[in-house]
Structure formats: C-alpha cells, structure tokens
Amino acid sequence: MHDIRAIRENPEAFDRDLERRGLSPLSAELIALDDARKGAVSAAQAAQERRNALSKEIGAAKKAKDEARAAELMAEVARLKEEAPGLDAAQAQAAKVLDERLAAIPNQPKADVPLGADEHGNVEYRRFDSSRARLAEGRQHFELGEATGLMDFEAAAKLSGSRFVVLKGPLARLERALGQFMLDLHTGEHGYTEVVPPVLVRDEAMFGTAQLPKFRDDQFAAGDGFWLIPTAEVPLTNLVRENILAEDELPLRFTALTPCFRAEAGAAGRDTRGMLRQHQFNKVELVSITAPEKSAEEHERMLACAEAVLQKLDLTYRVMTLCTGDMGFASQKTYDIEVWVPGQQTYREISSCSVCGEFQARRMNARYRAKEGRGVGFVHTLNGSGVAVGRALIAVMENYQNPDGSVTIPSVLQPYMGGLNRIEGPNT
C-alpha cells in the first residue's frame, strides 16, 4: 500500500519508480482521487460546522423570542440532517475508491534493483559449488521416485487430480527429515522463533500481505471468508497486524513449516510432470519484522540463512537478483536462490527472499514506537523461503542419485532418518 502523502510530495519520483516496473504514470490520477476524497471530507465537515453554528443561532433566536427566525433556522438544520448520511456515504466512497486504487499498485523497487522486463533481466549475485562433482546427466526425480514405487502420481490423481503426489516409505521420511532439519537450523543457529500457525486465514490477512485482491485467482478459497494459505508468509507476517511494537522488540524473526496451497492459474503447460509445480506442497518460511533502517541488513541476513540450508546439504546453487519486471507485487527487492537440477541440466528456484519495506505494514497497520520520542512509524517486513521442502527433495534426489537408481542421503539428514544412509533403487 502506498502513502498518498508521499506521492503528493514527490509525484515525479513515484512515476519514475512505476515506469521501472513497466507501468504508466499514475500520480496525477491518484492525486485527483485524493482531491475528491478531501473535497468529500470538507463538504461533510462544512455541513457539520454549519449545523453547530445553527444550533447556537437557534438558541439566540429563541432567547430573543424571534420564533419565525428560530423556525427558519430549525428547518435548515433538518435539511442538513437529511443530507448528512449522503455526505458521509460520499466521503466513505471517495476514500474507498482511493484505497482500492492504491492497493492495486505494486511496490516501488529499490534503486539498485536491475532494470528488466522479465526473468532474462535477472542478474547473478553469487553462487556456491558443491564439493561433489556436478552430474553431467541424470534421471529426473519423478523417474527415480516412480521406479522405486515411493513416488505415486497416479494414486494422487485418483485422490485429487493433477499436480499432487503421494510419497511413501523412506521417501516420505526423507521429505519429513528435510523440513525438520531446516527448522532445527533456523531455530538453533539463526535465531528464528518457530511458530505453528493456522493454514486457514481470513480476507484481511490475505489483503495484509497483498495476495488479495490482485491475486485472487491464484488462491484456494475455503468459503465463509477463509483462504488456504499460499505460503506461511501470510499468517507469520500478520502476527503483527494492528499492533504497535516497541523498537526494543525488533527485529522479530519467525519461522514455520506448513503446507502451502496454490491454484497455479497461470501455469498451464509448465512443469506438468513431477513435483516442481504442485497445488499442495510443504515449505519452511522465514519472516522478519524490523525497524526501517535495519531492513536492508536483515535482507542480506535472511538470504544467508536460506543459503545455509543448501550449503549444509552440499547442493550447487546460484543467487539471482530479480529485475524490476520479474519481482513480486509486494517486493522492493528480491533474491532468488536457484538450485542445480541435474535431471533438467539447469537451475530451478528453491527460495525467494524479499524485502517489502512498509508496503505490507501499511496494509496491516503494523507499527512501532521509536526510541527517544521519535514517534510512531510503520515497521518493515521481509519474507523468504527457508526453503521449499518439495524442491529440496527434488534437488537431493537428483544430485545424490546413483547409477543403480538408489539415492544417497546427505550426511546432515541421516540423523533424521534413523541412521539410514541411502534409499534403495529398483535394482539394488
């Protein structure tokens, strides 16, 4: 959500930022809507002030025993009373139109975000190479999983349709181990507080993190004003909704392992086989709430926490700075972590870490009281995957596969697997 006062103060800067996102100038339209809102407020206030003044005049007229004048004034008061609901409605409608327009505009990118139209404009930030030799070729995860009978898309399709999977036996345990390992790492070494949040949230929560109203078609509605969460970012970030925090409480760092649900409305024809793009998947989420001057530093820290997962799993990856045309709606700046997937001989996204500034905080009315009497301001919010569990499973299966179809379990996961060091293939 944007601050109309800031837009009024520097409309040219606002329009330049939107232009970097490929949008036409909007400041003039927004200022006109704000003028209409102010006009409606002024009209309602003027009417109320006139009523107050008339009340005094009526008293004076009655005191002077000027009944004709008193009757005339009372008739005007009655007329103003009749008009008041309409003026109030006009005021509310003008504010609603402005708020809805502001809510539909994406966040302003930071100055150091690369300019670009789509993913081809993303810029590599850094990379990490596994200590193991990169596989020049290999089977894809669904080929490995289906061969062992531990990954069943056919059974999932009977239950739920396409873009679902049933995992069994040691492969199901490996997926569970990955999530547990990530939580232990983020809580034990990175200082995040584990949260078990609801996976059903209300409209207001989805609005707060900017899934609604723009991305309604990408979500699963559960009825009665509830939505299945597309990411734990939604409940974790909304923990501070309508709160005023003390600056000493910041930063707040939350993590959660939850199922996530996405309609994938725009994904027709993409990644139709396997687990890369599912309607339901597990993900470990990281959320930070900070003071404004600390958010850039926290963004780098969050990225490093997500990277640590892949480094401990000894998986090759690269970090990409997303360009203006590829970054998310609520983001000021985003880093994507892309892990090497031998079955496709390419990098695929496994984490996305974003700083949103006060964009979400304004939608949630999440504020903090600064030290030394500096008043109350909006917090900054950050979110990142730490990481997507299903995609981590894909990466482990494909990078740790053996010629016989078995999968070696990374050493950091073996304690979570009861000492099991590999998942047997069909020929072992």
Swiss-Prot record:
Binding annotation for L-serine: 231-233, 285, 385
Pathway given in the UniProt record: Aminoacyl-tRNA biosynthesis; selenocysteinyl-tRNA(Sec) biosynthesis; L-seryl-tRNA(Sec) from L-serine and tRNA(Sec): step 1/1
Chief localisation class: cytoplasm
NCBIfam families the UniProt entry points to: serS (TIGR00414)
Binding positions for ATP per the UniProt entry: 262-264, 349-352
Protein purpose: Catalyzes the attachment of serine to tRNA(Ser). Is also able to aminoacylate tRNA(Sec) with serine, to form the misacylated tRNA L-seryl-tRNA(Sec), which will be further converted into selenocysteinyl-tRNA(Sec).
Family from the record: Belongs to the class-II aminoacyl-tRNA synthetase family. Type-1 seryl-tRNA synthetase subfamily.
Keyword Transcription regulation attached: no
Subcellular localization: Cytoplasm
Pfam families cross-referenced by the UniProt entry: Seryl_tRNA_N, tRNA-synt_2b
Organism expressing this protein natively: Methylorubrum populi (strain ATCC BAA-705 / NCIMB 13946 / BJ001)
UniProt-listed PANTHER family: SERINE--TRNA LIGASE, SERYL-TRNA SYNTHETASE
E.C. number: 6.1.1.11
Name of the protein: Serine--tRNA ligase
Free-text comment on this protein's domains from its UniProt entry: Consists of two distinct domains, a catalytic core and a N-terminal extension that is involved in tRNA binding.
Keyword field: Aminoacyl-tRNA synthetase, ATP-binding, Cytoplasm, Ligase, Nucleotide-binding, Protein biosynthesis
